[in-house]
Amino acid sequence: MANKKLRIMMVEDDSFTRATVKKALENQGLNIVFDTESVKSAITFARENRPDVAVLDYNLGPGPNGIDLANQLRKSLPDIGIILLTAFLNPAELDSKISSLPPGSRYLVKHSVTKIEVLVKEIEIAAKYRS
């Protein structure tokens, strides 16, 4: 399976959610090379290690949000696949910020992920942005 070779980083401020999603993805054979709650450490890791896909929460606590991080990552790594994984049911709830997602980014509502295969498929789609 091609997705086993993908190098995936996760940025999620909730440690339980981060650990749960990471374990579920690893159980699907995916390679989570880095997970953090910190925007700063995510940027540093990405610049030094060039992951294939970034799975980002929108609300990362005080400071930059997931869209801010997505744009910083795309600026440094133009071909990185990006998934914004959020609790917001409607992108309009993010106001006009949703339009500032980098091209090719995927938007996925956490509550819609009733099976981990949904997120795996989105990761595979996001990875195609690299092509």
Positions of PLM-derived features:
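Two-component/phosphorelay signaling modules centered on CheY-like receiver
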Residues: 15-34
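Active-site residues of response regulator receiver
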Residues: 57-59, 86
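Hydrophobic/aromatic residues positioned on beta-strands within the core alpha/beta folds
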Residues: 85-86, 110
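Non-catalytic signal-transmission and effector/linker regions of two-component phosphorelay proteins
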Residues: 1-7, 115-131
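Conserved acidic carboxylate
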Residues: 12
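His-Asp phosphorelay/catalytic-motif detector in bacterial-type signaling
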Residues: 5, 50-52, 76-83
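Acidic, metal-coordinating helix/loop segments flanking the phosphotransfer/catalytic sites
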Residues: 22, 35-53, 61
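Short amphipathic alpha-helix used as the core "switch/output" element in two-component signaling
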Residues: 67-79, 96-99
